[in-house]
Amino acid sequence: MLHFTAATSRFRLGRERANSVRSDGGWGVLQPVSATFNPPLRGWQRRALVQYLGTQPRDFLAVATPGSGKTSFALRIAAELLRYHTVEQVTVVVPTEHLKVQWAHAAAAHGLSLDPKFANSNPQTSPEYHGVMVTYAQVASHPTLHRVRTEARKTLVVFDEIHHGGDAKTWGDAIREAFGDATRRLALTGTPFRSDDSPIPFVSYQPDADGVLRSQADHTYGYAEALADGVVRPVVFLAYSGQARWRDSAGEEYEARLGEPLSAEQTARAWRTALDPEGEWMPAVITAADRRLRQLRAHVPDAGGMIIASDRTTARAYARLLTTMTAEEPTVVLSDDPGSSARITEFAQGTGRWLVAVRMVSEGVDVPRLSVGVYATNASTPLFFAQAIGRFVRSRRPGETASIFVPSVPNLLQLASALEVQRNHVLGRPHRESAHDPLDGDPATRTQTERGGAERGFTALGADAELDQVIFDGSSFGTATPTGSDEEADYLGIPGLLDAEQMRALLHRRQDEQLRKRAQLQKGATQPATSGASASVHGQLRDLRRELHTLVSIAHHRTGKPHGWIHDELRRRCGGPPIAAATRAQIKARIDALRQLNSERS
């Protein structure tokens, strides 16, 4: 605190001498900012503020994990700069229209008045405001207007989620034109990376050891640090797999299991089949998620859940499922519908159980009571995933946890396991996974694509669901178990108030109990579970696959090898196609081989 006071004192003395007289510039009288509006700062915010006031940079990039308080940090900076006349007005640039209102409300707690209704068509604003709220799209549509405003008075420009500044060349050019002459620029992001090579405006890039340019932050506060400080919640991922069946345009029928090593096309179609609201997978997962939410609400009565859908059609279908299954109509938010912002605010302040949204709520929107999520979208870039999960991590009290239900798809499981990994934006990456980023463009204006062209000729035939594994703190727990089973109930019934260490210990105990029961069943079994009600070929294949996946899970926990690696090794040893195309004899051979391997390691 001593360092904070010293830095602030140096800052005040210099600014009071330098700014004893100023001109209004025809834009109205600068409103005073009261020193009584100083909400308490978290540790990282205080350290970053000391760094900022001590160095007085023109450009500053703060990277802080979603939910850690970037907004409050920026508003405190703005209040300090206004109070000592370093700047005379503030412009905050955000991705969506809803965030304009959200920021304006937050600013009031810091003694600041920001105009959320400022429009390009009518650029006048009341002199009672300290500044204005605008979107990236709004700036891009008329950069000259915003350049004139910025040049007329000493301006602090705050960029919320600055990675959007690289969404298009025209956007980047517009932002540079509008705010190139700003007195101060403060950039914020929880995800300082993109899926393309578009440079982010006003962000510094430095070459790494390989000569590749990487973005450089002035202050970084990651998820792991925030978790240790109790600023964010621990996140538990419940990954659901299952057999998916579909028909292509030629009439050929296919079957595959989510989570198996599959081609990109097979993975996409199995994933799409699972997310079909008319199938069996989504109702089963929604049932499990609602059960988990009810468990949390026993300790946190206003805890809420959110389903993130791919498009408007499925969002409405999921809402109908929720209404039928829970006897409570959820809040539905579609960014192209009038009143969507008001519905988000109403849900955030209420106690309703479920919200269904199409991407709009996945970034920046503050709904602290969200504790359970269903990731029912096919978006899989690190940027979108990180922003989506960020909606659930904001901590309100010690011990709160977040539970996210995801399809057991390899790239999602990898992202879930690497939640604590720090990423930077890299320019010129040699092998980029995809040039398409689902967050490209302004989320407020982006079209929420309906299912169509790519899915014509594709027919989902159904998918069952089973809990494949639980991921926490980068580790996998549990083995595959059907929905509705006692083993699934053990994981869904985890207490709602646990810190990270308690959660880790409990998951280890649940896993040990599950593996012990499975081992006892294996010792007592004399025949594979392929008789009785499973006399059909389809039933036998289903049971054999389930048995194999259970053994693969056991091998995974014993060896630390990924599920996919174990499947590939079995194919190398035993031969044959991927499991979805394997015969009963081929699957039995893999089961025998894996049992032998497991017994050798026992």
From Swiss-Prot:
GO MF annotation list: ATP binding; DNA binding; hydrolase activity
Q: Which family does it belong to?
A: To M.leprae ML1624.
User: Which InterPro entries does its entry note?
Assistant: Helicase/UvrB_N (IPR006935), Helicase_ATP-bd (IPR014001), Helicase_Restrict-Modif_Enz (IPR050742), P-loop_NTPase (IPR027417)
- Signal peptide location: none
> Where does the record place the Helicase ATP-binding domain?
51-210
Task: Extract the CDD domains matched here.
Answer: SF2_C
Looking up SMART domains in the UniProt record yields: DEXDc
**PANTHER family per the UniProt record, alphabetical:** HELICASE ATP-BINDING DOMAIN-CONTAINING PROTEIN, TYPE I RESTRICTION ENZYME ECOKI R PROTEIN
Species source reads Mycobacterium tuberculosis (strain CDC 1551 / Oshkosh)
Tell me, what's a Pfam family for it? ResIII
**Descriptive protein name:** Uncharacterized protein MT2985
- Which terms in the GO cellular component ontology are assigned? cytosol
Output the superkingdom of the source species. Answer: Bacteria
